Amino acid sequence: MNRAPITALLLSVLCVPQLWSAESTRQILTPKPPAEARVNGPTIYGARPGHQFIYRIPCTGERPVRFAAQGLPASLHLDPLTGIITGHAPDKTGTYAVTLQASNSNGRSSRLFRIVVGDTLALTPPMGWNDWYSYYEQVTDKVMRQAADRMISSGMADFGYQYVNVDGGWQVNTNGKDPEVGGEPRDPQGNIRPNRRFPDMQALAAYIHNKGLKAGLYTSPGPVDCADSTGSYQHEEADARTFAAWGFDFLKYDWCSYTTVAPAKPTLADMRKPYDLMGGILKKQDRDIVFNLCQYGMGDVWTWGADAGGNAWRTTGDLGMTKDDRLPAFYNIGITNAALSSYAGPGHWNDPDYLLIGNVGDAFKWEQSQERLPTSLTPDEQYSYVSMWSLMAAPLFFAGDMTALDDFTLGLLCNSEVIDVDQDALGWQARVIRRSPDELILEKPLEDGSVAVGLFNLTGSSRKMTASLTDLGLSGGQKLRDLWRQKEIGEVTGSFSHEVTRHGVILVRFSPMRIGR
């Protein structure tokens, strides 16, 4: 094949109007998964020696599917019918290379899965669901169980979503207004109590685990959380032991009322103190608990969050409380987060907040109304949102109503090629190639030598955007693939251009062409 520059040819391929834009309708770009069994999910996974291990192999395809795992350590057991791996991580540190296999009547597939036993968890960004922007303080045990059920039945778990996380609202509320959530916050021994909406936290975690999923919890280092429910101040050791005994696998630690016990003008040491404390305590537990620091980016947390034991840290304030007249909030939050790429990597991730798509509540009115309405974001804005989070190796936590999932939202959440960008084992956050008031270009190197690139139009009208291979640090001929449609587009040398809709995105993957094919 002639390898001469083919920019003009590529442009003629790219300029199919419906290829990128979903603005006029809620066009589902993600293809339906094929009928044959296909193993999805990360290719690397961190665990601590001897700790309890649970992992559900993400797999699409027509059921029933039969699973196998070559090279699985002897301390672990795979259920061949459910694909759930349980047991305990090996006592010996090191990397255990496992080949995950899945087969059904339509075909089979396999995927390398490296279990790295050591001190680092979350070697890829955590994925799951958090209730806050849907239920706020009205969350219940029933809501969490339904969410776990829906994570399986919707197919989200088949693409790697695994954490089912309850935010604030499970604890006893200290303001005493509602007897259902009021009462004594701790038992006579000082152990934290859930409110009456959560009759048995250990049973809830077990319910989630029985599906092969993981359970997440929330508290504050202050006396109370942001809605006056019990915090962990001066009970850090006891609470960490309780959370581990209940069986929780993830802890979000929200600054909230810690302001009332910190100095009026806190130093960096003051800001670090509660997170250093809890991070050290969690490491002493006999359970793997991913630690999520939520203190809104104060004190440049990205420079010290990993040293405090954090696996992810919020880089800004709440996305749901951010407003802007020009751009949707996710753009402003994302652009801030994008500048911090050098601080992210395996086991420690910049967290720009949750995916507020689907049906969500109003963060400004949550105390007055529990109504959950469809997001006001346009379809193109939603594609931009998920594309940006994936390029930035952000934790992917859906925060919409799990009971109101529709096909369009599932298409956004469950595109295996887009998720692979987020979960890539190299663990690089995309770097900013170009940033202006009108456009943003992000580039993320991937483990196989390819690069994922997002071209984001920040203006209120369509505009032509161009990226050259020189801009991207690439050379020679490159194959170009549309990640949302999961289709090869063509080949390019030099540069490529395309008209991008308002607030829209082009998300592509460049791979070196092989000479002599």
What role is predicted for each listed range?
Residues 238, 288-401:
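Glycan-recognition surfaces
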Residues 491-517:
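C-terminal beta-strand-rich structural cap/linker in extracellular carbohydrate-active enzymes
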Residues 75-91:
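Strand-loop-strand motifs at the edges of beta-sheets in extracellular beta-sandwich domains
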Residues 383, 389-392, 397-399, 434-474, ...:
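Carbohydrate-binding surface patches
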Residues 37-62:
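Solvent-exposed, low-complexity, repeat-rich "mucin-like" stalks and linkers
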Residues 26, 107-119:
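C-terminal edge beta-strand
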Residues 57, 93-106:
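A short beta-strand micro-motif common to beta-rich folds, especially ectodomain repeats
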